[in-house]
Amino acid sequence: MTFRHCVAVDLGASSGRVMLARYDSKHRTLTLREIHRFVNCLQKTDGFDTWDIDSLEKDIRLGLKKVCNEGILIDSIGIDTWGVDYVLLDKQGQRVGLPVSYRDNRTTGIMPQALVQIGKSEIYRRSGIQFLPFNTIYQLRALTKQQPELTAQVAHALLMPDYFSYRLTGEMNWEYTNATTTQLVNINTDDWDDTLLAWTGAKKSWFGRPSHPGNVIGDWICPQGNRIPVVAVASHDTASAVIASPLANKHSAYLSSGTWSLMGFESKKPYTTDEALAANITNEGGAEGRYRVLKNIMGLWLLQRVLKERRITDLPALIAQTEALPACRFLINPNDDRFINPDDMRAEIQAACRETDQPVPVSDAELARCIFDSLALLYADILHELANLRGEKFTQLHIVGGGCQNALLNQLCADACGIRVMAGPVEASTLGNIGIQLMTLDELNNVDDFRQVVSANYDLTTYIPNPDSEIARHVAQFQPKRQTKELCA
């Protein structure tokens, strides 16, 4: 067969999309077409920040039906989403309550309990995962302690992409790359860790053994009656994005830029040393047994909140105004946990500047400048941490995802990090999702083979660092500004 048609369902914390890929195996060309795009946002339910899971499922099914109604024979479907959040099911496989978002404050104070009762080094030795207050381990502890009546009804817990696959196929699956984000998977066995799971109060019977990407979960029956395989892709969206990152060699780092920024490198081994623990480095699962050694950065969430609060719709115009402003007048630590979900992001940024005796950004452009400069300097700081961890410098940084369209931030990143930046592809998570499907269909050999396809089909933009830029002169001064309460213990 010359042509393959695969559908990627890619859900982010702010939007979702159903994308159709067409792969020509003879010429190794790959094209994407957006079929359906929809909004994903938090809602308040009984005092909790929850996801409208039924609306998301409705939009997923609508997108799939649109493809089928075009008369296209779909070869496979794959679903990726953000990590850590989950859906609870009862014995009949029916949903129990609504899934609570990782941004909800129910986990406040939970992580410190684990550090005392289990021990920080012991948790890290077992999981190899960074300490974030909203990791699934702490969410489950909050659930079992705060909602025992709800907990009593639970028979299964599925992570978000596995839930949607279950709704399409009727088959339950626990995909490995996303499972590792829970901080509950043992890094040595690739299975759920009994000690960590027991601490949460959740039952091990709620979970099946994690499966690696590339297996067929089951079939979705389309309106025309065709049975279409649903593939377990690398269902954590960052894992999919990394698969589509055209990393040139071992000296290349990646930055998946969106609501969150995930900066790291690929490795055949995990890093769980005391140095890695001190830097709060995570070792999330990847495809083909690789590890995604990385750090979470708050990312463009800060900007997204400012845009929403200020009702700004013309982002290019705002960026143009921002670029005209002097650099580094206002600097914050984007990873300060005060920015996780404040009532007023603009006011929170202003307060952070005021508390550190800096000028206070007032205009929208000044707020954006503060965010961009601070992110670029944090990227440089974390890239330095990662290089020290592996004992080797990086020569190139690949920025993928929606954030790679921000040319100003890309250049600031190159200047601050002092290395060449390659930006693209934009739809990295979708492409990585498609890549695993094509491998499962025996159209591609492995991840490296797929990256050659990506490089041949998608243009990348190069940014050369300017060592004389204003931001480059602030790199050494930024470290003290990070001495705030970050997203870690």
UniProtKB/Swiss-Prot annotation:
ATP binds at residues 13-17, 259, 304, 402. One of its GO terms (molecular function) is glycerol kinase activity. Pathway: Carbohydrate degradation; L-rhamnose degradation; glycerone phosphate from L-rhamnose: step 2/3. Pfam families: FGGY_C, FGGY_N. GO terms for cellular component: cytosol. The active site is at residue 237. The keyword S-adenosyl-L-methionine does not apply. Disulfide bonds join 68-222, 353-370, 413-417. Its EC number is 2.7.1.5. Keywords: ATP-binding, Disulfide bond, Kinase, Magnesium, Nucleotide-binding, Rhamnose metabolism, Transferase. GO terms for biological process: glycerol metabolic process; rhamnose catabolic process. Substrate binds at residues 83, 236-238, 296. It catalyses: L-rhamnulose + ATP = L-rhamnulose 1-phosphate + ADP + H(+). It is an enzyme of class 2 (transferase). Coiled coil: none annotated. It comes from the Bacteria. Its cofactor is Mg(2+). InterPro entries: ATPase_NBD, FGGY_C, FGGY_N, Rhamnulokinase. Involved in the catabolism of L-rhamnose (6-deoxy-L-mannose). Catalyzes the transfer of the gamma-phosphate group from ATP to the 1-hydroxyl group of L-rhamnulose to yield L-rhamnulose 1-phosphate. Belongs to the rhamnulokinase family. This is Rhamnulokinase. It comes from Salmonella paratyphi B (strain ATCC BAA-1250 / SPB7).
